[in-house]
Amino acid sequence: YNLSTMWQSPNGTIRAILDGTVFRAPILVKGIEPYVKNWEKPITLARHAYGDVYKASEMTIPGAGKCELVFTAEDGTVTKELIHEFKGPGIVQGMHNLEASITNFAHCCFKYAIDTKQDVWFSSKDTISKKYDHTFKDIFQDIYDAEYKETFEKLGITYFYTLIDDAVARVVKSKGGFIWACKNYDGDVMSDMVATAFGSLAMMTSVLVSPDGNYEYEAAHGTVQRHY
C-alpha cells in the first residue's frame, strides 16, 4: 500500500483515544447452535480498551547487555528495575496502563451488569503479575465494595475475581448469561473463542463504550473471511 511507516492498528488507535470498554456478545439465532452444548445464554466479553500490549514499546536486543525499566519522576528521582541480563540477542517489550483507565473499565463493567442484571466475572494472572495484574484486581474489588456491592446484592447478582486459567475452565462448564471482564489482550482472544463456540465468529457484536458517553461500533475481528 506504499505506506511511509508500519502504522499501528486503526481500531487500536481509536480505542486508546476514546478509552472505555469494548463489550462483545454473540448473536444467537435459531439454526446456529453452540458447540458447547450447556451454554444456554450469551456470554458478554467486557474488554478493556486501553493499554497493555496494544500500547507497548518493543526493542530487538542485538547482543549481550543489561536491560532495565527506568522511571524518572517530575522531581528528577530515578527508579530502576532490572528486566534481564542478556547473554546474547533477544527481544524486550515494555507495556503500561493507567489507574484512571482501569477505574473507568471497572465502572463500565459494573454499570453494564446492573443495566442487564448479569453477574460479573473478572480474570487476570495476579499470582504471576504481582504488581501489574494485581493492580487491576485491587481496583475492581475496591470499587465494587465501595460503590456497587449493595446494589448487586439487591438485584441478586454477583461479582467475583478468579485467575484467567480458572475462568476459562469455569466458562466452558457454565450455562452462560454473565459478563466476563478481561484485560485488553485477554478480551481480544477470548471474545473470538466465545463467539466461535457459540456457532460463528461472524455472529458477534462489538461496541466500545467510553467514559464520557461516546460509542464506537466496529467489526469484532479482522479475519472473518477465513472462518466462513
Question: What are these model-derived regions, one by one?
Answer:
Residues 71-75, 79-164:
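Glycine-rich phosphate/diphosphate-binding loop of Rossmann-like nucleotide-binding domains
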Residues 2, 55-60, 131-136, 171-174, ...:
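Short acidic, glycine/serine/threonine-rich loops at helix termini
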Residues 171-228:
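Glycine-rich phosphate/nucleotide-binding loop
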Residues 1-78, 185-189:
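N-terminal glycine-rich phosphate/adenylate-binding segment common to multiple enzyme folds
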Residues 6, 34-39, 84, 113-114, ...:
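Solvent-exposed alpha-helices and their adjacent loops that cap or buttress functional pockets
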Residues 16-23, 48-50, 54, 107-118, ...:
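Generic secondary-structure signature for well-ordered alpha-helical cores
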Residues 22-24, 162-171, 225:
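Glycine-rich oxoanion-binding loops at beta->alpha junctions
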